[in-house]
Amino acid sequence: VLAAGGTLVCHNENLLDQQWHDRPALPPAASWRMPIENAGKSLAEKSADLAAYLDAKDCAAVLLTRVDSVNWLVNMRGGDLPCTPVNLCFALYHCETGLCLLGDQSRLQPVLTPDITVAPLTQLPAMLGDMGDGRLMIEAARLPKRLCERIMASGVHTSAADCPLSIEK
């Protein structure tokens, strides 16, 4: 952009939201679980592997911001994007408290189990405040700017790393 004579400008607001006033709602929820024979491992097995990885990296939790990684971990699929079978959500996995999907509960309801909680993304700062001295692993290069600002403002200790599920997937 700069080489072509353009200018980069940082905006704190989503410019699309400011212009797209008649944006259609998401399609009706169509979440489902992948059968274990297709998924390869259960959520419990994947969670145990993730907890061991985080422990080895001296982290208490990880914020998963890759939609494909969250869907893979939970063995779920959905209809939130045309031609891409995913549920749009992030996840916070804590070694002690388990998995919390950060998204719309009504859309995620079909895949929820007793070992999965769900909260709106707006509750993330409060959840991070409860971490104490535990370190949060984040994939800084893929973290939305607004979310990064909220994490930094929460005072939680962070550890930057690639998504721990990328190789496993």
Where are these regions (language model features)?
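Flexible, acidic/His-enriched mid-domain "rim/lid" segments that flank
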Residues: 1-76, 81-87, 93-99, 106, ...
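Compact, glycine/acidic-enriched structural inserts
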Residues: 105-117
